[in-house]
């Protein structure tokens, strides 16, 4: 892959990550459905995990409601048909009526499926005593 393709792909992934987080804040399951791979593995900071259907159901039913999110990416690495995004995500989330403050380092994985980038995995690691 040429450097210009890599830069274009990195820019595309950055835009998709921004769109994904906006959809999370808005509770927009239509956009999340479009962005997520059918093979999604979404791990949460307390180690529970969802597949695509259960994640969209939780967002759609407001099981958790994202109130605030910051998500600066430290690095976007495009390797073949995959893109790895690392960074720090902080959030204020309403989970079953309780406000939860989240502060994680994360790895988000995007893959090319049928010519389009799809969000396939998320793995956070809580930052202790931040």
Regions from the language model: what does each represent?
Residues 2-35, 39-130:
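A beta-strand edge to alpha-helix "cap/lid" segment located at domain peripheries
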């Amino acid at each position: 892959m040429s450097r210009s393709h890599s830069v274009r792909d990195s820019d595309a992934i950055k835009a998709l990550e921004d769109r994904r987080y906006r959809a999370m804040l808005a509770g927009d399951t239509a956009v999340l459905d479009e962005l997520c791979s059918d093979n999604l593995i979404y791990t949460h900071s307390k180690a529970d995990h969802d597949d695509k259907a259960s994640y969209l159901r939780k967002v759609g039913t407001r099981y958790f409601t994202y109130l605030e999110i910051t998500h600066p990416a430290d690095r976007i690495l495009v390797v073949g048909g995959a893109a790895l995004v690392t960074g720090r995500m902080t959030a204020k989330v309403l989970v079953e009526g309780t406000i939860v403050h989240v502060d994680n380092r994360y790895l988000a994985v995007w893959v090319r499926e049928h010519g389009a980038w799809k969000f396939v995995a998320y793995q956070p690691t809580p930052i202790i005593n931040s």
